[in-house]
Amino acid sequence: MDNYFGTDGMRGKVGVEPITADFFLKLGWAVGSVLAKRAKASVIIGKDTRVSGYLFESALEAGFLSAGVDVGLLGPMPTPAVAYLTQTYNASAGVVISASHNNFQDNGVKFFSAKGLKLSSQYQSEIEKKLAETMISVGADKIGKAYRYEQPLGRYIEFCKSTFDRTQSLLGLNIVIDCANGATYHIAQSVFSELGANINIINNTPDGFNINEHCGATDTKYLQQVVLESKADLGIAFDGDGDRLIMIDENGELVDGDELVFIIAKAWQSQGRLVNNTVVGTKMSNLGMHHALRDLDIKFIEADVGDRFVMEKMQKSGSILGGEGSGHIICLNKTTSGDGIISALQVLEVLVKSQSSLAKLKQSMEKYPQILINVKTQARINLKNYTKLQRTQLAVEQTLGDESRVLIRVSGTEPLIRVMVEAKDKIIAQQGAEKLSNIFK
């Protein structure tokens, strides 16, 4: 049986299996057949702004209908919005057609349960078993019905605003927002301006091809430039599907997911709101975050890389706050998934209440230099096959000394080997990362 699900759904090149119309048709049928076992089922489908979204939306819709499942179409919508709307529309599942921060040549799909949570491994296994079967449509009298929702944007915008302390206001704040020409393009400005901020919005004119193109959470150079030139108070960057957040302080410096989680954690602890005094991060979380949380007596729990695994650890530990340096931040007391807009609102609430600036708020956490090198591969590989790797890694670790870390892993979403080296000395960390990455070239 093929294993189609990665750490964040399915993702790949459009037109290359499994990212084809034929496969998405069968995938819709397979997921629908699993859902239909439990009750009369309905799903909602959202997508980001890449041109291939229309193709895969139609294929999934046909697959679900052929399994007897009703389908509600949302149109372009951030991933976290679909998680929220799955619950409010009382759907059996939510579906997002997106390749997140990747460029337009890629696409993929993510699923949410009726509770707005990523599907469990058990659920994914059921779907993959169904995919191995022959696709057989239900009878004509049992085919599902399709419809399009008229006002999903308004519901989500009001929900986002409700997560911000309404005794506070963003009045007087000058904010630059980069929508990555993605799914937040028609939502972000409304949320932040209706809370009082002066908004300068950039990269909010998607054409199907420019999603994540030199913009958004994975490429903040232009945003940093605009923040400085306009003398804005801060910048906010989302990725293509709106589940990541990176911020820029008033000095044009990047503030990543680890720093943002720390800012929220410190504030919530001081307010007695940090449930179980616990934060969940990943193996990639900066050592500076570990130390800063420890100094506040906040427990840090380490999960595997991927927001799905962060969520699992949060649920097991009873934590309400977790995230990744890449910008996936989960505020479980506010929503059920990583949400760029809602996470930004939590940081802004801290900023407004403290009458501080983003540059000052991040000073309490001293980041260690972290060098990440992504090495492209033709296919998924097994690290155990690289006999030289263990010897080289041991030598690098000895050179780095204490207060350092080496992490080498196969990406769960792309054909990449990720080599991360972290140490107090940036030059030594860079040399170590290059030595290790050269093994795979």
Swiss-Prot record:
Gene3D superfamilies: Alpha-D-Glucose-1,6-Bisphosphate, subunit A, domain 3 (3.40.120.10), Alpha-D-phosphohexomutase, C-terminal domain (3.30.310.50). The keyword Metal-binding applies. Keywords: Isomerase, Magnesium, Metal-binding, Phosphoprotein. It catalyses: alpha-D-glucosamine 1-phosphate = D-glucosamine 6-phosphate. Its cofactor is Mg(2+). The active site is at residue 100. The keyword Magnesium applies. One of its GO terms (molecular function) is phosphoglucosamine mutase activity. GO terms for cellular component: cytosol. Pfam families: PGM_PMM_I, PGM_PMM_II, PGM_PMM_III, PGM_PMM_IV. One of its GO terms (biological process) is UDP-N-acetylglucosamine biosynthetic process. Activated by phosphorylation. InterPro entries: A-D-PHexomutase_a/b/a-I (IPR005844), A-D-PHexomutase_a/b/a-I/II/III (IPR016055), A-D-PHexomutase_a/b/a-II (IPR005845), A-D-PHexomutase_a/b/a-III (IPR005846), A-D-PHexomutase_C (IPR005843), A-D-PHexomutase_C_sf (IPR036900), Alpha-D-phosphohexomutase_SF (IPR005841), GlmM_bact (IPR006352). It is an enzyme of class 5 (isomerase). Mg(2+) binds at residues 100, 239, 241, 243. The modification Phosphoserine is found at residue 100. Belongs to the phosphohexose mutase family. Catalyzes the conversion of glucosamine-6-phosphate to glucosamine-1-phosphate. This is Phosphoglucosamine mutase. It comes from Ruthia magnifica subsp. Calyptogena magnifica. The gene is glmM.
